Amino acid sequence: MVLEGNPDVGSPRTSDLQHPGSQGSCILSCPGEEALAGEEPIKYGELIVLGYNGCLASGDKGRRRSRLALSRRPHANGVKPDVMHHISTPLVSKALSNRGQHSISFTLSRSHSVIVEYTHDSDKDMFQIGRSTENMIDFVVTDTSPGGGATEGPSAQSTISRYACRILCDRRPPYTARIYAAGFDASSNIFLGERAAKWRTPDGLMDGLTTNGVLVMHPAGGFSEDSAPGVWREISVCGNVYTLRDSRSAQQRGKLVENESNVLQDGSLIDLCGATLLWRTPAGLLRAPTLKQLEAQRQEANAARPQCPVGLSTLAFPSPARGRTAPDKQQPWVYVRCGHVHGYHGWGCRRERGPQERECPLCRLVGPYVPLWLGQEAGLCLDPGPPSHAFAPCGHVCSEKTARYWAQTPLPHGTHAFHAACPFCGAWLTGELGCVRLIFQGPLD
């Protein structure tokens, strides 16, 4: 048996890992340590799951929801690296993991493990994200299927880790948030087995990747009207940034990207191999439209009394309070290839191309004919612009800047594929642009 302590493990290159709190997730209603009675706690930021348009199909409940605000906890729950042990027998490894000490275990072989222990850090909070419903997980995330909705039921094969990742937030200004792969389990341990990608860093420390990986993309130019998609990277257990592996579960890591960090920015995307999350900062959310603004835009669009150019019936976007069940009688429909907006009609089908293919009576272009739905998750919008564009082929409506940004943003799919998708429902985008400008006809009177 060899037990070697290494005090250098707490150097700045090692992540400031965190201790999961017993309080559960700290959302907007949780009191902050320094918040006075009736005041909101300091908010670090918000996580929004793509594909739900503001609410889970079954409703937002507890830690399982489509959106979660991370706020300062009543008491810091941080831990930081303390000592690194080289273990030559599995018995000692088991003894260490059972002491209640927070640690990361790197199994190098059947007879050799490296365990990094952590001590309390009063300057940081941690929030854990994953598929597990255990108390140490603050935000329970399940797989999102293309077209909206979660993959549910015991037969569903999830690719999201039970303890997928953790976000560490500084308790003092500027409240920087950093993301790390993997989260602590019920025994306060992060375990990387023999098959996991792991290695010794140049300064003698350990690092590794999770099985399916945690990918992050920071937008170029911030999350605003001038934003452009960034480059997808993989985040390690210790928070280092690497280029992507050949596939999500490959054992060979990518190259270290030294000039990039794991600090979350407004608009950063986090992919957990089954669900993609958007990080919004408090400052960024101030620039985003509010639900009241989105409702005002809906009422303004309906007040213009758009008409079906063929049936001459007045069209109107339904209230979001109705939910997305079946299209309303006055619901606008669109030919997604050309953008001409009509009321619903049952003619113009092209049987040789399937029931969803229709011929536009105005321009004769043939393509999908779908109802229009307003995007209701305000945090996904880049600007408060008018609802002028729709994603193809799902028909979700938003501003031009928002539509063009998401249509140009490739989202991870499967083990190595990327595909642009509607942020409101998760449907894969089609066509040359992925979105279309809507062409309404005003009232004839």
Swiss-Prot record:
Its EC number is 2.3.2.27. Pathway: Protein modification; protein ubiquitination. The modification Phosphoserine is found at S11. Phosphorylated by IRAK1 enhancing its E3 ligase activity. GO terms for molecular function: ubiquitin protein ligase activity; ubiquitin-protein transferase activity. Residues 1-24 are annotated as: Disordered. Residues 12-24 have a biased composition (Polar residues). The keyword DNA damage does not apply. Pfam families: Pellino_FHA, Pellino_RING. It is an enzyme of class 2 (transferase). It catalyses: S-ubiquitinyl-[E2 ubiquitin-conjugating enzyme]-L-cysteine + [acceptor protein]-L-lysine = [E2 ubiquitin-conjugating enzyme]-L-cysteine + N(6)-ubiquitinyl-[acceptor protein]-L-lysine. It comes from the Eukaryota. One of its GO terms (biological process) is negative regulation of extrinsic apoptotic signaling pathway. The keyword Phosphoprotein applies. Keywords: Immunity, Innate immunity, Phosphoprotein, Transferase, Ubl conjugation pathway. PANTHER family: E3 UBIQUITIN-PROTEIN LIGASE PELLINO HOMOLOG 3, E3 UBIQUITIN-PROTEIN LIGASE PELLINO-RELATED. This is E3 ubiquitin-protein ligase pellino homolog 3. It comes from Mus musculus (Mouse). The lineage of its organism: Eukaryota, Metazoa, Chordata, Craniata, Vertebrata.
